[in-house]
Amino acid sequence: LQNLVMKEDEKICGTERKLPIGIDSFEKIIRHNFYYVDKTEMITELLHNWGEVNLFTRPRRFGKSLNMNMLQSFLEIGCDKSLFNGLKVSREKELCEEYMGKFPVISLTLKNVEGLNFESARKSLKNTLGMEAWRLSALAESSRLTEEEKNSYKALTVVDDHGDFKNV
């Protein structure tokens, strides 16, 4: 239980702290002061032992999505560094300086991809991919990309007359 992030006062703004059941947003858990078991050491372990592919296997409801969202919250350009104040990873000053808020992060979850048939599931998947490409559309202006890569990226965000992503 020593990893449980506790505040001095169990009551915040007159309300008791709650368990974050079903919440997979790291930012929401921290900002709304839900109980949180500090798993930020995972960030340190992952960045020190980086593999070409990292596989995270756990049964359903074991925090995979929350951990991936925590990692995104740490690495993504423009992240709110204060979210990690007081958490274990914040003690790793060099690691935070090198990695925190330094990367564009493509984050895809297939939780909401659904359909009653192949075409509707495909359309739902295309929408999920297109929305993530649109969220990171500033990447299409990166000086690190060739013109061809920029054009390919921009094509991912084109929508048709029905509001569907055309080129995903």
Briefly describe each language-model feature range:
Residues 13-19, 98-105, 141-152:
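Short, compositionally biased low-complexity segments
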Residues 53, 106-117, 152-159:
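Short acidic, glycine/Ser/Thr-rich loop/turn "cap" segments at secondary-structure junctions
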Residues 48, 73-143:
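P-loop NTPase motor core
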Residues 4-78, 82-92:
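Walker A/P-loop-proximal flanking segment of P-loop NTPase domains
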Residues 34-35, 117, 121, 125, ...:
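Phosphate/oxyanion-binding active-site loops and adjacent basic polyanion-contact surfaces
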Residues 26, 71, 125, 129, ...:
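Generic structural signal of hydrophobic/aromatic residues within well-ordered alpha-helices
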Residues 135-168:
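Mid-core helix/loop region of P-loop NTP-binding domains shared across ATPases and GTPases
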